[in-house]
Amino acid sequence: MTQLQFSESARCCRSKERAISMNKNESIAISAAIGRAISENAPYIAYSDTDLKHDYEEYTSDEISALTKAGYIDGDFEKFFVIREFSNSLPIDDIPGAYMRRLFSLAKKLDADIFMHDPYIENVKIKETRRGKILLTKADYVRGEILQYDMPYIDDDIVVPRLGFFTKSVCFPALYEGTVPWVSVCPSEINSMKEQMERACGRVLVLGLGLGYFPYIISAKSSVESITIVEL
């Protein structure tokens, strides 16, 4: 059994969590530590279907019900397993229960088939190209690799990252300066543009091309008359 276990008395879910209040600055610090762990280590959880089956069988039905009631499981044990394993690997001693519950509830098991059939991902082919320190290439997420799929959840009391993972490998265009990723067509980039892409209409001015995802997608909209791109 991993660090995410149950107290023998209340049978309540606990991980590296403590049942006390937390202020917003504390949640920001925890989220920053999680962000660093992801960006610096590209962590992934290696597991098989057999691992999932055996892990699930270690829980009683009452424990699964308690986890579900507490907001850790939403019917998808695989998602719970991956996020649990990642959270237990973090170099953080104490994480408040309210933060952990929000972290698990926001997490997503991303659909690799939907991502790879995105019109841009499916149709735009790139050839690896290097000019000086700049490299245009393909990046990837392997099965179980932890990523942030969208901007963090923010309200008056808490800031929590939106964690996700794919159940099989995916690849996508990316631009690097040296070893530093500058821009890529990854889930977080796509999701950050969704609202603007939905609202795009008429004559659209795009400031900065990036890898061209935004203008490519809106060019298919009948409501968009023209697209002007300004790139410095």
Set out the residue ranges of the language-model regions.
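N-terminal auxiliary segments of SAM/dcSAM-dependent transferases
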Residues: 6-9, 16-165
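Residues at the starts of beta-strands that form the adenosine-phosphate
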Residues: 203, 225-226
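Conserved alpha-helix/loop element of class I SAM-dependent methyltransferases that forms part
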Residues: 173, 187-201
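Conserved SAM-binding loop of SAM-dependent methyltransferases across substrates and taxa
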Residues: 211-222
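Conserved acidic E/D residue at the C-terminus of a beta-strand in Rossmann-like folds
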Residues: 228-232
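Surface-exposed cleft-lining segments at the edges of enzyme active sites
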Residues: 178-187
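Short polybasic amphipathic segments
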Residues: 171-177
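Conserved class I S-adenosyl-L-methionine
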Residues: 202-210
